[in-house]
């Protein structure tokens, strides 16, 4: 039976196993999806388990989306650009590949709404693990500016590198097109 995991810390709240196990059972896929709480010092051993094919792949959540990168062999262009990985797989050449599917997920959700983001001003509240991916996607959608508000100034400033100089320091909420 193929084994897949979602890793994070904390991880007890994750509904990913329920969702993935439901669809695997519904589609007669011989696999199991579990959650595992890791600490930073567990990451190298965890990646070894994928390399040794004890685990077929994993989803990555906070706080490991950046922290896992040094243990990977390759990154997709989106993962490289955002320095954020949420999916790990062994590729056909037995290389550990880090993917970022958050970008595509966000883009598809926006496309579903049929809302045009071109030249819109966007306000983001918070700078959590998925925000680099959202900023990257918004820039691809050609927004005019992104305003970010976060509890910690340093984390918000760290995200400036993903903004293509479109992130504003100050803005009035009345000027924002999308919140």
What does each model-found stretch correspond to?
Residues 154:
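Conserved Rossmann-like nucleotide-cofactor binding loop
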Residues 56, 144, 176-179:
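Conserved acidic residues
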Residues 164-178:
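Short acidic low-complexity segments
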Residues 8, 100, 110-143, 147-150:
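Glycine-rich adenosine-cofactor-binding loop
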Residues 2, 119-120, 177:
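Nucleotide donor/acceptor-binding cores
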Residues 2-113:
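Phosphate/diphosphate ligand-binding glycine-rich loop within oxidoreductases
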Residues 158-164:
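Short, aromatic/basic amphipathic alpha-helical patches
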């Amino acid at each position: 039976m193929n084994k897949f995991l979602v890793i994070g810390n904390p991880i007890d709240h994750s509904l990913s196993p329920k969702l993935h196990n439901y669809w695997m059972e519904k589609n007669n896929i011989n696999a199991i999806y579990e959650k595992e709480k890791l600490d930073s010092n567990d990451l190298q051993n965890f990646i070894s388990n994928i390399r040794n094919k004890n685990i077929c792949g994993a989803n990555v959540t906070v706080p490991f989306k950046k922290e896992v990168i040094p243990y990977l062999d390759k990154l997709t262009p989106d993962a490289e650009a955002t320095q954020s990985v949420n999916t790990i797989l062994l590729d056909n050449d037995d290389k550990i590949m880090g993917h970022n599917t958050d970008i595509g997920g966000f883009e598809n959700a926006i496309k579903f709404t049929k809302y045009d983001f071109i030249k819109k001003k966007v306000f983001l509240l918070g700078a959590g693990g998925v925000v680099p991916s959202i900023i990257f996607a918004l820039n691809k959608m050609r927004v005019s500016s992104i305003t970010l508000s976060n509890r910690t100034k340093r984390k918000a400033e760290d995200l400036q590198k993903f903004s293509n100089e479109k992130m504003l320091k100050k803005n009035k909420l009345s000027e924002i097109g999308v919140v």
